[in-house]
């Protein structure tokens, strides 16, 4: 079951593909006011734009894999229509009670308890095979031939939950990434995403003076994201994107996190926090039950504390460049080892669930 968020869709598809069973994709489009409907506990399709979504018709499936608040009522509705026969697997943190789900696959930013129907992973799931990465690398390599190495990828997300990637933050990200590339004598491979505001992307690109390759979402041509993942010697990732952090980490190369937060000042003093997305997120956090809390900082802190990542901060370019240089002469870490283990464990849990039923 797919929605509007690329990160959610990546996890759902990764699990479905790895299961190796036949499946159908159902694209669900929610109405703008769906939050008001979904605050209740009932099973309803009232918040769904049925005319813009994939039709939901019998025969009902043995398994539904979903992610995100907007798709929850649809998954539960399907189970109701099947007379309880359909098993439900949800990625992340559900709004409905935990007993409504046969399995919840979660990560540290959510504060879910330890229980039999909850599987805790360290990072979001993804499924990038060596063959896919190699093909993407082969396609992109000619465009990067004249850029000096090391190649530092800059993976840019955007507005998500309470985080807003403003033009000023885009400029700061560009300046810090520029300093890092200059310190190690390399170049930048920059790609943004559908969530990246034009003001942030423009400010970031304007701040770059080192050699660089820059792809803007919607600019036409093949998306180089997988090629950049395959070829980059190090990664800078905006911290609000758990999926991009997980995919970059899985490559086994140095990882730096750019903090998209607003710092210590109260949120209500900043005009951008009164936009619909950050304001509705705070509303959801206030009105939802206590278990609905989310702190992306948990994943970031875990990555940094374990030495798997470091912060991209002012004045840190020299130390980061030294770490990048040291990594380039050290034996390369096996890409995706942790991610692959967690995907395998998740698949095993889902197969047990379906077999038992």
What is each model feature region?
Residues 264, 269-357:
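C-terminal amphipathic helix plus adjacent low-complexity
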Residues 4-29, 170, 174-175, 192, ...:
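Soluble, non-transmembrane catalytic domains of enzymes that act on hydrophobic metabolites at membranes
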Residues 159-192:
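Conserved catalytic-core segment of nucleotide-activated headgroup transferases in glycan assembly
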Residues 5-120, 245:
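Active-site and donor-binding regions of nucleotide-sugar-utilizing enzymes
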Residues 184-220:
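Catalytic donor nucleotide-activated moiety binding site of glycosyltransferases and closely related
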Residues 91, 107, 121, 191, ...:
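Generic beta-sheet signal
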Residues 4, 227-268:
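A donor-sugar binding/catalytic signature common to diverse glycosyltransferases
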Residues 99-166, 340:
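A nucleotide-sugar donor-handling region in carbohydrate enzymes
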């Amino acid at each position: 079951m797919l929605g509007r968020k690329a990160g959610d869709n990546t996890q759902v598809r990764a699990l479905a593909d790895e299961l190796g069973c036949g499946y159908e994709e159902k694209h669900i489009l929610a109405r703008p006011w769906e939050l008001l409907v979904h605050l209740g506990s009932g099973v309803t399709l009232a918040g769904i734009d049925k005319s813009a979504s994939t039709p939901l018709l019998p025969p009902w499936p043995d398994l539904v894999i979903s992610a995100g608040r907007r798709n929850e009522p649809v998954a539960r509705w399907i189970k109701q229509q099947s007379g309880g026969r359909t098993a439900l697997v949800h990625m992340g943190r559900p709004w409905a009670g935990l007993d409504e789900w046969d399995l919840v696959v979660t990560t540290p930013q959510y504060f879910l308890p330890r229980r039999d129907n909850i599987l805790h992973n360290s990072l979001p799931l993804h499924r990038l095979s060596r063959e896919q990465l190699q093909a993407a690398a082969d396609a992109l390599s000619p465009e990067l031939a004249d850029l000096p190495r090391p190649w530092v990828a800059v993976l840019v997300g955007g507005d998500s939950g309470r985080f807003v990637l403003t033009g000023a933050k885009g400029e700061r990200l560009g300046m810090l990434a520029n300093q890092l590339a200059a310190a190690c004598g390399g170049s930048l491979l920059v790609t943004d995403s559908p969530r990246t505001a034009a003001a942030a992307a423009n400010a970031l690109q304007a701040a770059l003076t080192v050699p660089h390759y820059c792809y803007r979402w919607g600019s036409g041509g093949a998306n180089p994201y997988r090629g950049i993942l395959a070829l980059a010697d190090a990664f800078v990732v905006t911290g609000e994107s758990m999926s991009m952090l997980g995919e970059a980490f899985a490559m086994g190369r140095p990882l730096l996190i750019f903090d998209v937060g607003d710092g210590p000042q109260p949120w209500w003093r900043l005009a951008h926090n009164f936009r619909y997305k950050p304001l509705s997120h705070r509303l959801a956090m206030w009105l939802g039950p206590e278990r609905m809390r989310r702190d992306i900082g948990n994943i970031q802190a875990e990555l940094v504390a374990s030495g798997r990542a470091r912060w991209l901060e002012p004045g840190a370019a020299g130390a980061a460049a030294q770490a990048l240089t040291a990594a380039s002469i050290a034996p390369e870490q096996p890409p995706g080892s942790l991610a692959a283990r967690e995907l395998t464990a998740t698949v095993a849990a889902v197969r047990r669930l379906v077999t038992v039923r």
